[in-house]
Amino acid sequence: MVIDEFQEFYNINESVYSDMQNIWDTYRKKSKMNLIVSGSVYSLMQKIFQNNKEPLFGRADNIIKLSAFDLTTLKEIMRDNNPNYTNDDLLALYTFTGGVPKYVELFCDNITLSIDEMISFMVRDNSSFTDEGKNLLIEEFGKNYATYFSILSAISGGINTQPEIEAALGDKSIGGQIKRLIEDYNIIVRQRPILAKEGSQAVRYEIQDNFIRFWFNYFDRYRSLIEIKNFVGLQAIIKANYPTYSGIMLERYFKQQFAESFQYRAIGSWWEPRGNQNEIDIVALKLEKNQAVAAEVKRQKKNFKPELLTAKVEHLRNKLLPKFQFELVCLSLEDM
């Protein structure tokens, strides 16, 4: 038996969960049923099965969190859909969808996977992308969604420390909302310099989902353009900003590429807690003892200044990793 949108019983008849607990506990060993339930509201599904105060706590034999396509699969999809694709097209698919099958399928069923076609398909009248972020998250947040949306909008725009976010929201205290966005909703994560201690105050917040990040940065921020159906104007803004925005996402792409290679024991960025100085885009510690990679990420290799990265790595080595041997690289579009 398969039950989809299992969390909806909260809105219909919450006692269903207690009834199911009694039936399951009584007949589980006697029956030959494989019961599968699924749901799209992360926080409620977590509550149902992982909150020890809920009747179905501990009853799930297996919990599967559906993941996005990995980078190898995205490349295969690109080759099948657009054999002449460029790495910039691949980066755009990653930037806009994060590999979420639903969004990738929408693109593949309707267009050729190129930057311009993807932007035109997303930003048009009656596009399913226009309200997708709102529809996904209002169900999670409920009627008090406004503050959460303001926080996510700030983070998507590069305001990523708690004091900066609170200042952007008029000095509103947001500690509780930040905690829930991390622990209950699984939407943002804390980023600390690599090897920083858990209690370190050098924290930046980041939206995990590529599409949600993109949606807040453009669809939510430029809602006024959508309301007057100025889709041409919004397309122009996205295209003009694409080199800068995709450059940020290229760093995320390479971190994922490092992770999927299974050759590293820790992957992150590094910066000094005070002043964000000597920042290194990617620091990856290899499985081999005292071996690491330090990478500067640039869309174009011609913009790379090796002497700057060398100075930053020496600073990191002296401060944190004195015994490490570093491989210094520049990663660009051509390395995807």
Q: What positions do the PLM features span?
A:
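Phosphate-binding site recognition
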Residues: M1-V232, A236
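A cross-kingdom feature that marks ATP-driven nucleic-acid transaction machinery
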Residues: Q201-M336
